[in-house]
Amino acid sequence: MKKTPLLNVALSRVIAGMGHGDILVIGDAGLPVPPGVEMIDLAVTPGLPDFASVLRAVLSELQVERHVLAEEMQKVVPPALVEIERLKGKLGKREWLSHENFKVLSRSARAVVRTGECQPYSNIALISGVTF
């Protein structure tokens, strides 16, 4: 059995296959998944799993070079942003895009992870780094 916190097979597979510059999106329950992009649906009920728990589990395995957030997040300040601030040392450089442009960016993601999070704009694009 794996020793790291991340147990989801599909999510572990995607992370293991990511290379430098690849994108993984973690989204709230309402974020649309573009056609042709793999969706890893973790949502069970509203709020379960929450965005923060999924982000922490992903960061246990993924080396992140930078991350992208929607500008609208700064106005709404969902709990996800509080967790992102807490984890900023593991997230690399930050970039801001409009929510519409964030959705355009998600078209080039290796996968979109759908959480049960129901707070608006609780989405992040993680751009993979290297460990060497």
UniProtKB/Swiss-Prot annotation:
Main localization, broad class: cytoplasm
Cell location: Cytoplasm
Record bears the keyword Transmembrane helix: no
One Pfam assignment: RbsD_FucU
Residue numbers annotated as active site: H20 (proton donor)
Family statement: Belongs to the RbsD / FucU family. RbsD subfamily.
GO biological process, one term: D-ribose catabolic process
Metabolic or biological pathway, per its Swiss-Prot or TrEMBL entry: Carbohydrate metabolism; D-ribose degradation; D-ribose 5-phosphate from beta-D-ribopyranose: step 1/2
GO molecular function terms noted in the UniProt entry: D-ribose pyranase activity; intramolecular lyase activity; monosaccharide binding
Residues at which substrate binds: D28, H99, Y121, S122, N123
PANTHER family given in the database record: D-RIBOSE PYRANASE
Function: Catalyzes the interconversion of beta-pyran and beta-furan forms of D-ribose.
GO CC annotation terms, alphabetical: cytosol
Subunit record text: Homodecamer.
Protein's recorded name: D-ribose pyranase
Source organism of this protein record: Pseudomonas putida (strain GB-1)
EC number: 5.4.99.62
Keyword Cytoplasm part of the UniProt annotation: yes
UniProt keyword annotations, A-Z: Carbohydrate metabolism, Cytoplasm, Isomerase
Main EC class the enzyme belongs to: isomerase
Reactions catalysed: beta-D-ribopyranose = beta-D-ribofuranose
